[in-house]
Design a protein with these regions (language model features):
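Rossmann-like S-adenosyl-L-methionine
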Residues: 177-188, 192-297
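SAM-dependent transferase fold signal centered on methyltransferase-like domains
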Residues: 1-212, 224, 253-260, 297-298
């Protein structure tokens, strides 16, 4: 036991005396080091059970409700390689890039050549960029000194359209030899957008507000149900499009709209919920604090 609260305690696992029937060997070789996944030691069925119980516990313990009926978590047919967005921090010494994800509760980069949650095309994209950074000895960003150029790699992939976006986040206004990198990335089937995002702020915020197109378009397209969306590097868009459609359809079914209602969608982003509900409601109003994102479908 490492910490005790009034009604619960925190503990640290020291030894497994008898494994749960749901305990499995993580599919990812760096699962024990990377902070991206916390439940890979559980079977997928075990994860769904854990999440269902967690919702029920929170409603009862934090919300103070009792006798609440909580439906079982709806799972995916294939719970791997589902993410349509990846954000890879870049660091290490110049010529020896580390690209991957942060270790748990830290900003120490765990070099990750392969991620089991990301689209497979990301493995190829990272491999190309890693070779480029090494070959041209591009300065890599150091979060402690705020020196170096390349901070992050952001990718977005349209699940339905197959369109791909690659965004390099840089601590400056230019990327040396970017024409070489563009030519190499363009060889990937589906490549639609290659952009540079300028972030010179001395913060942990990943993206800046300034975007320059190096090749192709500034946006890619994807669908949720029958609704098409244009997605920029700055857009908020659900990272699991298959389950997003399940989630939105479930909410729409629960709403039992008859076609005369007005729906208000707060913090609407690019309007994924707004436009999905517009199929049934009379009026839908989306409210967004970021003007550029809010105007994406105007």
């Amino acid at each position: 036991i490492v910490k005790t609260k009034k009604h619960f305690s925190y503990g640290k696992l020291l030894e497994i005396l008898e494994p749960s029937p749901h305990r499995v060997t993580p599919a990812c070789p760096v699962a024990a080091k990377c902070g991206g996944c916390q439940l890979q030691h559980l079977s997928y069925e075990g994860q769904l059970s854990f999440k269902t119980k967690k919702v029920k516990d929170h409603l009862e313990r934090i919300g103070g409700f009792s006798g609440i009926s909580v439906g079982y978590a709806k799972g995916m047919e294939e719970p791997w390689r589902y993410r349509n967005k990846a954000q890879f921090p870049v660091g290490g010494k110049t010529g020896e890039p580390e690209i991957g994800f942060y270790a748990k509760r830290s900003h120490r980069i765990i070099d990750t050549p392969v991620c089991m949650l990301q689209n497979k095309i990301n493995d190829q994209i990272v491999k190309i960029i890693r070779a480029f950074l090494t070959e041209y000895e591009i300065p890599l960003y150091d979060e402690t000194t705020h020196r170096g150029l390349v901070r992050h790699i952001l990718t977005r992939i349209g699940r339905r359209t197959g369109e791909i976006m690659v965004c390099l986040v840089v601590n400056g206004r230019k990327l040396p030899h970017c024409d070489v990198l563009v030519e190499r990335l363009r060889e990937i089937e589906g490549m639609t957008s290659i952009v540079l995002n300028v972030n010179t702020a001395q913060t942990n915020v990943i993206l800046g507000t300034e975007v320059h197109v190096l090749w192709g378009k500034e946006t890619i397209r994807d669908y949720i149900g029958d609704v098409q969306f244009e997605i920029s590097p700055l857009s908020f868009y659900q990272v699991n499009p298959l389950q997003t459609q399940v989630l939105y359809q479930t909410a729409l079914d629960f709403a039992e709209l008859e076609g005369n209602e007005t729906v208000l969608d707060l913090y609407c982003g690019i309007g994924t919920i707004s436009l999905f509900f517009a199929q049934k409601a009379k009026h839908v109003f989306g409210v967004e604090i970021v003007p550029e994102i809010g105007r994406a479908h105007v």
